[in-house]
Amino acid sequence: MEEIIINGKCLYSSKGAAREYGPVGCNFYRGCPFQCTYCYNRRGLTAPVLGVDHAVLEDCFTKEKNRPKKYRDISAETYAMIVFKRELERHLDYCRQTGIFFSFSTDPMLDETHPLTWRAVNYAVQKQVPVTVLTKCAFTFELHNDWFGKNLDYHQGLQKYVSFGFTLTGRDDLEEGAARHFSANSDRIKAMSQLKELGYNVWASIEPVIDLDSSFEMIRESLPYCDHYKIGLQSGVAKGYYGSLSKLTRFILHVRKAIAEYPDVTVYWKESVRKELAGTHVDEHLKHPQFIGGGFEWVKKKEGI
């Protein structure tokens, strides 16, 4: 597949660590009420813009001066959807191969963000474009649109193309920035089990690994309901943060042993892990039939897309 660089208002080509989640992302909003202490959006030069404590629809949609005159009398959300449709049509064949990731700059299932997210997801599915949603909001599925109460026909129309991911750190104490949005890690695993029962592809982002024991416990508890894991280390920490190389080795071997009981489960070890192990004997442990590439490869393999 020839790479296409997308630089739209909604869709864009991801870079660096973000690309390991998917080559194409969609960001309607920036900011997040969780204010997790480890969030990469809260660090660096872009923190005042991306790290705000509430979700904000991007200026390119909200400010009239940024819109063509014929679109200035409609809502910002409606205009955002028009732009999304136009950009997706322009890159349709490519996005059918890469899928679309929601979202790198906010949680797409917040009260404020999920209505527009779902308009976009449903449109993408109509166009046979796979999408994946990464969230910490387990309760959104129950509170909005009676998600688990919908008839099976509704879910069958989405199952092949929509995958749900949940961030699992095992450290609720670092994620309680906004009580009205907060879902404990245990609540997220419960939502994973319900979505799995409905036939969806379900995955977990074990990133960042804040401490090895907590992360492994999240993997162990979620394994019956999870199709895929993406595991990455915490950025910006001091060398030796995870202790000796032998501790990281044991973590990898424990993961290998745990997933062996679930042969259809796959794992992607992010570059942060592979870089930590480069040049050591331990990187041999990352060679395993259930350890695969990043992006949407696990969904495409599973669904035959």
What is the predicted function of each stretch?
Residues 244-305:
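C-terminal accessory extensions appended to soluble enzyme cores
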Residues 32-34, 47, 110, 217, ...:
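Residues in flexible loops and secondary-structure boundaries
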Residues 49, 134, 205, 269-270:
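Residue-level detector of family-conserved "landmark" positions at structurally sensitive sites
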Residues 7, 15, 98, 156, ...:
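Feature targets compositionally biased, intrinsically disordered low-complexity regions
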Residues 1-3, 8, 57-58, 68-71, ...:
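Intrinsically disordered, low-complexity regions
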Residues 1-79, 83-99:
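N-terminal [4Fe-4S]-dependent radical SAM core
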Residues 79-259:
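Conserved AdoMet/S-adenosylmethionine-binding subsite of the radical SAM
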Residues 43-45, 49, 55-56, 117-119, ...:
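General N-terminal targeting signals
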